[in-house]
Amino acid sequence: MGIRCSTWLRWPLSPQLLLLLLLCPTGSRAQDEDGDYEELMLALPSQEDSLVDEASHVATATFRRCSKEAWRLPGTYVVVLMEETQRLQVEQTAHRLQTWAARRGYVIKVLHVFYDLFPGFLVKMSSDLLGLALKLPHVEYIEEDSLVFAQSIPWNLERIIPAWQQTEEDSSPDGSSQVEVYLLDTSIQSGHREIEGRVTITDFNSVPEEDGTRFHRQASKCDSHGTHLAGVVSGRDAGVAKGTSLHSLRVLNCQGKGTVSGTLIGLEFIRKSQLIQPSGPLVVLLPLAGGYSRILNTACQRLARTGVVLVAAAGNFRDDACLYSPASAPEVITVGATNAQDQPVTLGTLGTNFGRCVDLFAPGKDIIGASSDCSTCYMSQSGTSQAAAHVAGIVAMMLNRDPALTLAELRQRLILFSTKDVINMAWFPEDQRVLTPNRVATLPPSTQETGGQLLCRTVWSAHSGPTRTATATARCAPEEELLSCSSFSRSGRRRGDRIEAIGGQQVCKALNAFGGEGVYAVARCCLLPRVNCSIHNTPAARAGPQTPVHCHQKDHVLTGCSFHWEVENLRAQQQPLLRSRHQPGQCVGHQEASVHASCCHAPGLECKIKEHGIAGPAEQVTVACEAGWTLTGCNVLPGASLPLGAYSVDNVCVARIRDAGRADRTSEEATVAAAICCRSRPSAKASWVHQ
């Protein structure tokens, strides 16, 4: 499941139709299907406009739409222009499309023009004009509008806020907060006792009509979802971040349905508010989900670049969250839902989404919160919307303590201090268990109590696909440093992994092999102040038994090892050794492999290797870094018949091998998981710890 892309072609305009259009009065007005009128200007084509009529002109833009047919909204399209397009060019492009359409007897309506979040415009038009629109100058792609949905069907506060922290107040002495949360949802009953005086109802309203001619808009029902979530975020009694200010933007109708375009306009509204009246830290809660949308993910990325923290529901479809937006946006903190037993939420035949796009889970089952039935009523709701609201509240509390925290720091701290290994992973599909995080959110302690700790997380790539030349790429956030790269293949057929530069950013790339079923790249992404990293490469030695590489720059320490094979040789394939017996602190690989050492320098950075081996049959071996140390690199050392790969799970290195239950295995053939553990002590010098 994903997006389908296609390029549309239009047919040449007939001479008779062209003559008819030219005979029409220049200032005539056309009526669209909604009964609204729009000024259309018909004129002889200019030399520039006539270029589009050349048969040789081929559209370079692409057309995208939701993979779920029932969620599509044909006839409404977001025309996305190149990132560097200027405001005047956006207006000219929209006007040109109107002009070209009018010559062909079509009326289109420009519903909204985007300037502040991305260059583009929302247009209502016939699908017959898509081929024409794709040939417009500056157009990067066109995305058909689609639906998004609300994701909902006092143990929760006890779970995410430890008892010793519940007595602390995270707001200022007068009970206020400098953090503002924007909620994109249904309307809200702002007079409820839980949130009274804390909610600002904006004049923003961008929702589709409700389905069904007999639908009755009951105010309390229309406000239900938004009121409940507002109470979860900042309610007086049932809220997480008590005292936090909320701004309500209505993007979901009374049935809990909205559109991608309405959500985009809502995000741009927030950006405009930022520009007009800069304020303190902003958190945007997106308790909704629709099919994968490139433009919605891009809009989230652009808003995140301005310092806004976005928190999104993973979705309630018991499916891979990467297939939905905004959950799949890398710049969004994506939240799945658990119940009171810290297990994945089941909602009838569906349940919480999962997979590599989920950052962590939070309470999302039978959550007590404000009800819109009356100003003192309460009700329970379930879903990943409620889970996302909990994390939005936690983020607001963290920012209220330390407004300077960035998105990368917030995410890393949420991961570090989450409750780990409590979820029964058997609930998830087998192929998703290794990708899905086993973490439930809790409120982290203040930064003063944990300052200086090296923070790292694991980022998985999408699956590469099965072709022999297929690759997979995992990327860190711009603020993070890529300290190591590894790979994993369920078939074991892979040509290794390496760190390389793409578009000015270091990325982790994994290579599939002939006969392989695909591969994952696994990046270890860390926050390390004043770090300077470089990759040292050694090509295949060929003549010698091993290929060694080490950190030769002064004060640089080894944080990761990787290798790759230029020529496939599965019989000889082995992971790189992290050291030889006489020379610790270097990567040593097979003579036919190119070996890469990730070497970094930062004030007080010190690293060491920790190993654990099993001589008998084993499908996986693990080794963990001690308290105070952070895992930066993970490898499986030779000994297994065929290693499937290695990856980091929080602070644990996991080495996976194909079932190697041979009775004649010896201790020298033990499968070994090797972890590189580092810590940052700013007062000390960078060093390698010999063990």
Swiss-Prot record:
GO terms for biological process: apoptotic process; cellular response to insulin stimulus; cellular response to starvation; cholesterol homeostasis; cholesterol metabolic process; kidney development; lipoprotein metabolic process; liver development. SUPFAM superfamilies: Protease propeptides/inhibitors, Subtilisin-like. The active site is at D185 (charge relay system), H225 (charge relay system), S385 (charge relay system). Residues 1-30 form the signal peptide. GO terms for cellular component: cell surface; COPII-coated ER to Golgi transport vesicle; cytoplasm; early endosome; endoplasmic reticulum; extracellular region; extracellular space; Golgi apparatus. Pfam families: Inhibitor_I9, PCSK9_C1, PCSK9_C2, PCSK9_C3, Peptidase_S8. Keywords: Apoptosis, Autocatalytic cleavage, Calcium, Cholesterol metabolism, Cytoplasm, Disulfide bond, Endoplasmic reticulum, Endosome, Glycoprotein, Golgi apparatus, Hydrolase, Lipid metabolism, Lysosome, Phosphoprotein, Protease, Secreted, Serine protease, Signal, Steroid metabolism, Sterol metabolism, Sulfation, Zymogen. It is an enzyme of class 3 (hydrolase). It is found in: Cytoplasm; Secreted; Endosome; Lysosome. InterPro entries: PCSK9_C1, PCSK9_C2, PCSK9_C3, PCSK9_ProteinaseK-like, Peptidase_S8/S53_dom, Peptidase_S8/S53_dom_sf, Peptidase_S8_subtilisin-like, Peptidase_S8_subtilisin-rel. Monomer. Can self-associate to form dimers and higher multimers which may have increased LDLR degrading activity. The precursor protein but not the mature protein may form multimers. Interacts with APOB, VLDLR, LRP8/APOER2 and BACE1. The full-length immature form (pro-PCSK9) interacts with SCNN1A, SCNN1B and SCNN1G. The pro-PCSK9 form (via C-terminal domain) interacts with LDLR. Interacts (via the C-terminal domain) with ANXA2 (via repeat Annexin 1); the interaction inhibits the degradation of LDLR. Belongs to the peptidase S8 family. This is Proprotein convertase subtilisin/kexin type 9. It comes from Rattus norvegicus (Rat).
